[in-house]
């Protein structure tokens, strides 16, 4: 009985596929500039550290910030002007209602001269034109406000793009220095998501079937991890191999080489 158990164990061991994989961050992002400008600060001492809400790269945004203040002041003034004009419009609406009513009353009166009637008519038309002009001015101001809101949003995005933040990511590499002028698409930094880790292996064609159901052993120890991603398209570099990835908990130390075995149990 013991001999049978040993034989079964040896068969399972021989049947297991052995791979080696480096523990890598879950994601490494290449950060490029969305704007042009002068780099004010790029703190290389942050490399290897987990970043906070504070910017790790700052591109000069002084003029953008001043312009945004001016735009927001204009928005406030236009908003106040619209409110005043809308109050004027209400008054003009009431005035027009009275003038229309008065004109309807005097128009059929025979003892009123045509000159008096014309005067009332011209006064009514003038008031109606004033009402329409005020309404038109409100519409124009609202268009200006809409344009300024768009400008404010664009400036806010530019300012954000010039103050780079990557909270909870690790600064993997700094690619610019303070005093450097950058343009759109200039590489700035690399940041890593270390909240999880990944192991990448390349399977032979015959190993792809049921690979996600296999039991994974890491450095000889059975784990609860399974293959998380499996491509059914052969890798462009590792010819006739199929990439598989295992997502694992974040380790204390990355870049270690681990031995992986895929077994039936």
Place the predicted regions along the sequence by residue:
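Sec-dependent N-terminal signal peptides
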Residues: 3-13
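Hydrophobic alpha-helical membrane-insertion signals
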Residues: 18-20, 168, 175-178, 184-187, ...
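Short histidine-centered loop motifs in beta-beta connectors
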Residues: 38-50, 169, 173-176
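Short hydrophobic beta/alpha edge segments that flank linear recognition/processing sites
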Residues: 43, 47-72, 156, 160, ...
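Extended amphipathic alpha-helical segments
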Residues: 73, 80, 122-166, 180
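Extended, EK/Q-rich alpha-helical coiled-coil segments that serve as long dimerization/scaffolding arms
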Residues: 102-128
């Amino acid at each position: 009985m013991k001999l049978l158990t040993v034989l079964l164990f040896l068969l399972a061991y021989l049947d297991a596929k052995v791979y080696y994989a480096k523990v890598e961050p879950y994601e490494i992002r290449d950060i490029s500039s969305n704007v042009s400008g002068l780099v004010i600060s790029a703190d290389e001492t942050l490399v290897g550290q987990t970043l906070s809400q504070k910017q790790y790269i700052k591109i000069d945004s002084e003029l953008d910030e001043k312009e945004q203040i001016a735009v927001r002041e204009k928005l406030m003034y236009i908003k106040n002007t619209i409110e005043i004009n809308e109050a004027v419009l209400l008054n003009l609406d009431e005035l027009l209602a009275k003038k229309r009513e008065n004109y309807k009353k005097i128009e059929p009166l025979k003892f009123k001269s045509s000159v008096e009637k014309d005067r009332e008519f011209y006064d009514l038309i003038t008031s109606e034109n004033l009402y329409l002009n005020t309404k038109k001015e409100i519409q124009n101001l609202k268009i200006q406000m809409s344009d300024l809101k768009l400008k404010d949003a664009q400036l806010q995005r530019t300012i954000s793009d010039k103050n780079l933040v990557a909270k909870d990511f690790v600064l993997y590499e700094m690619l610019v220095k303070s005093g450097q002028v950058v343009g759109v698409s200039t590489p700035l930094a690399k940041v890593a998501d270390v909240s999880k880790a990944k192991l990448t292996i390349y399977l032979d064609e015959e190993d792809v079937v049921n690979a996600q159901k296999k039991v994974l052993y890491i450095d000889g120890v059975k784990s609860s991890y399974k293959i998380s991603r499996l491509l059914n398209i052969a890798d462009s570099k590792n010819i006739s191999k199929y990439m598989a990835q295992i997502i694992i908990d974040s380790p204390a130390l990355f870049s270690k080489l681990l031995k992986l075995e895929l077994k039936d149990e």
